[in-house]
């Protein structure tokens, strides 16, 4: 870790009272209470205006409540303070030649709503999808159980009705059963028997 970066971390932790949270690429991360602070590092021997503002744009796209750009004194010639202030971006100048006293916050960053990180969005989507899937399954199971119980109840009612009819038939007196059976015989049955007797008597 080079000396300007060490001075920068020391200033943010010991002077500004933030907690160092790590480094990702050319960005140092700090924690200020519940807020995340990103400090972009742009230390070079030869500064380019286009590259400087490109880095500022990249910092504004990070999921941080505050963002700073840290540069060496030579970069001040390309800095437009109005642009930094209008966008709420802080500016930190690090002069290694001055040692621990060589870090100065020229422009303080303005707190802004932190962008929601894509990973957090994906996590929320996954949790919501899982919840909806479980609820849908629960509703389907409940509906299926209600339909099953309804069908079983109707089947039992039909069975009981048929059983009652059979029991009524078995409990009926013999005369009624015979009458019921004779009522089912063809009407021409008795007449046919009489004709058979007449024909036999004439033989």
Curated annotation (Swiss-Prot):
GO cellular component, one term: cytoplasm
Keyword Cytoplasm included in the entry's annotation: yes
Subcellular location: Cytoplasm, Cytoskeleton
Keyword Lyase attached: no
Domain of life per record: Archaea
UniProtKB keywords: Cytoplasm, Cytoskeleton
Location (main, coarse): cytoplasm
Chain's role: Part of an actin-like archaeal cytoskeleton. Prevents polymerization of crenactin filaments by binding its C-terminus into crenactin's hydrophobic groove. May act by competing with the D-loop of the following crenactin subunit for the hydrophobic groove.
Miscellaneous comment text of the record: Belongs to a conserved five-gene operon within Thermoproteales denoted Arcade (actin-related cytoskeleton in Archaea involved in shape determination).
Subunit structure and binding partners: Interacts with crenactin.
Annotated domain remarks: The C-terminal helix is essential for activity.
Protein name, entry field: Arcadin-2
Gene encoding the protein: rkd-2
